[in-house]
Structure formats: structure tokens, C-alpha cells
Amino acid sequence: MDGFYDQQVPYMVTNSQRGRNCNEKPTNVRKRKFINRDLAHDSEELFQDLSQLQETWLAEAQVPDNDEQFVPDYQAESLAFHGLPLKIKKEPHSPCSEISSACSQEQPFKFSYGEKCLYNVSAYDQKPQVGMRPSNPPTPSSTPVSPLHHASPNSTHTPKPDRAFPAHLPPSQSIPDSSYPMDHRFRRQLSEPCNSFPPLPTMPREGRPMYQRQMSEPNIPFPPQGFKQEYHDPVYEHNTMVGSAASQSFPPPLMIKQEPRDFAYDSEVPSCHSIYMRQEGFLAHPSRTEGCMFEKGPRQFYDDTCVVPEKFDGDIKQEPGMYREGPTYQRRGSLQLWQFLVALLDDPSNSHFIAWTGRGMEFKLIEPEEVARRWGIQKNRPAMNYDKLSRSLRYYYEKGIMQKVAGERYVYKFVCDPEALFSMAFPDNQRPLLKTDMERHINEEDTVPLSHFDESMAYMPEGGCCNPHPYNEGYVY
């Protein structure tokens, strides 16, 4: 029966066994008392170590902020429970990350404004001086972890809450010095307000704006607009703080810089350089220094960045006006070939090389090379000929704008309605200004004078083998 404990009841109880149990009972009681005393002694040593660590933390917490940066204490507390060696990592001071860590560690818990003010005032007032012990030395019952170990000796197996915030305190309640001391977490985190701007070096601690808190907003000088605010996971915060203290500052939300809209510039308006890139963008107005060509409509102001590539002395120089009575002839950047042909047909002075046949919308190129030459002048292509012009006209066959009349040479016809044709060719009844040979005349200053030749005499060839052939001009060839 020696193997039975006092909690087990044997099947038969005899006098000898009862006497033996009576003799063994004090031994078991002494054994349990010894175990309890050892457990209490171990707990007291553990709590005493934590108390000493707490005093060390409280003394180091009074060091100015620009000295070093501390690792949050709950990390050290968890290390103390598991018996791992405690190391406080010292890193260069970063006020932005420290302020953001103080803000971010409080994010998962929702406090009213008054409660946070209470923690600020009480924790700030109870700070002892640097290098001095508090008036009431912490006892095993006053350590931050002691309330977790009063229930039973096996309280280490109970789940420990993440944060032990006394959120049940009313805002108007004051905490005396002799009562339960404020947790050292509040001494470091809640006594320093989270400022949206870093404090000035000359500003004293009492002069900073107190109780200014931000739950989830990052440290930016202006509130973000239109961004969703999310509370961060404490597990993620714990991992980032264990890994690196520099990663405690959460990145601010992505701010997309928007440039002020310049109403004098339209993104769909092609630049003047693109218009004159292939020398096709000659404007139809006599003053070619105004405006740019684009789809939506003309710009009704003088654009001094538009440079016309060629200016001839035959052009009539006009002062550019700020506003015009009507828009110039502008269709998709340049004059198209079918519009050029309509403009030639609309001018009766061109009837000697192009004219209507009188059968609907048919017209005939009486002198196709002259038409091609004028089209080359319009497009600044001196090598233009009828072969190239006819290849360009085939493009309009596919588009359904014109057709070649079968059986007749140099005869074409427009297949669209006449009113629609002229309305598209001449928008707002503005006739295009076509280039003529007057713009291509040769300036006398650009030629070399032949003053050393005498036009009155006849030049004879050096060899007299053949008779000269006089001409009317007096030259001999």
C-alpha cells in the first residue's frame, strides 16, 4: 500500500494500514509544503529578477531620447519567461521610427481620448529622477507580471494576454503614488505624444502639444484624402520590431502628384514641329504664322512657337492678329489631295488644265502634269509627276471618295453627294489658299550677274570647221 497516495482509496482498510497511513500523512504534508515552498522560492527569485530588470528599465527610460533607441519591453518580458538571455539592442536614434512605433503599437486597441490623456498625465508625473530608485520599491506583487501568477502555481500555463492595459479606469480617476504603479510600457510610450511634426530642439518637453494622437495615420504633415485607413496586425508589428527597428515606421500611402492643368495646352493638339516635320502643314490663311492644325478646331490665339519653314519675298507680310473673324481652313493637319482637286475645280481660272465635264461630279485633268506640278508646289515636292499623283488617287478608290471613269483618259468623278463634298472640303465656307508660281519666283539678288558677257557680239567657235548658226538672240551654239 506504500504506492497509494492520500487521494486514492484502497479496497480494504485494516487497522495496521490505517495506522500506517496516519504515520505517512505528516510526511506527505511536509512534502507538499516543501514543494510549495520551493515553487514560491523559485517564483520569488523570478519575480525579483524581473523587478530588478524593471528598475533597470525605468532608470534607462529616463535617458534623453537622442541617446539611444529601446526595444519594446514586452519582447524582453517574453524572453524572461522562457529563460533566454536578455539583450537590449542599441541602434542610432530615429525620431520618426520611434514616434511611429509608439503610435503603431497602440493601434489595435481602441481608447477614448480621455483615457489616453489619463495615461499621459499619470505616467509623466510618476517618472522618477535619473539614477534614483522610486520611493516605493517594486515588490513581487507589484511587478507587471505578478497579477498573472496569483491564481495558482500553474499560472504559467494560462494564456497570457498580449497587452495588459487597465482600460477600465475612468478618465477622471487619478492614480496615487502608493497604489499599483503604472506599467513601464506606459511610461515610455504614452508619455510621449505622437506629433505630426518633429519637435523643435529649443522647445522644452512641457511646451510640446500634449495628447495629440494618431491611431492609424502615418507621420505626414497633411491628412491623406481618399485613402483607406487600416489597423495593422500586432503580430506583424512584433515581427518587424524583432527583425529591425528601422522597419517599424510604416510607409506612407502612395501620394500621386497631380500637376496643375495648363489650359493653354491640349494634350491632343499635335505640336507645330510634328505638323511641319514633312513640310505638309502650310496653313490656308494668308498669315501663316498663326495657329496650329489639329482635329478639334483652331486655336484662336497667336502661337509664336510655330515656325513656317519657308518664307518667300513674294509673300504678303501681314501683322499677325490676336483674334480672327473666322477659323482658317484646317482639316486633320494638312490639305488632302481630294480637297486640293475640289479647290482647283472651284476656281474658274484653272479651267485650262482641270475642269468639270458637266456629267454629275465628273472632272477631267486636261493637263495632268500641270495638276501634278501644282500639287508638288503645294506639298513642297518638286519631283511630283502624274504617275505619283495617280497612285495617290487610287487610295481614294478604296475609301469610296472618287472613282476612275472607265473608257476615258484622265477623267475621274466624286461618288459622294455634292453638298457633302463641298461641306467637307470647305468647312465653314473657308476656301484654302493654294500656292502659285508667284511664291516660287527667283530673286535677282540670288543670281550671279553675267556682266562679263557682251550680248551684242556673236561668239565664234575656235575651230572654223563649221559655219555658225545665228539665232535671234544673237548667240551662236
Curated annotation (Swiss-Prot):
Transmembrane helix recorded as keyword: no
Primary location class: nucleus
Record-level GO cellular component terms: chromatin; nucleus
Feature: DNA-binding region: 335-415
PTM annotation, UniProt: Sumoylated.
Disulfide bond in keyword set: no
Covalent cross-link Glycyl lysine isopeptide (Lys-Gly) (interchain with G-Cter in SUMO2) as placed by the record, residue numbers: K317
Subcellular localization: Nucleus
GO biological process: axon guidance; cell differentiation; mechanosensory behavior; muscle organ development; peripheral nervous system neuron development; positive regulation of transcription by RNA polymerase II; regulation of transcription by RNA polymerase II; transcription by RNA polymerase II
PANTHER family referenced in this protein's UniProt entry, alphabetically: ETS, ETS TRANSLOCATION VARIANT 1
Record protein name field: ETS translocation variant 1
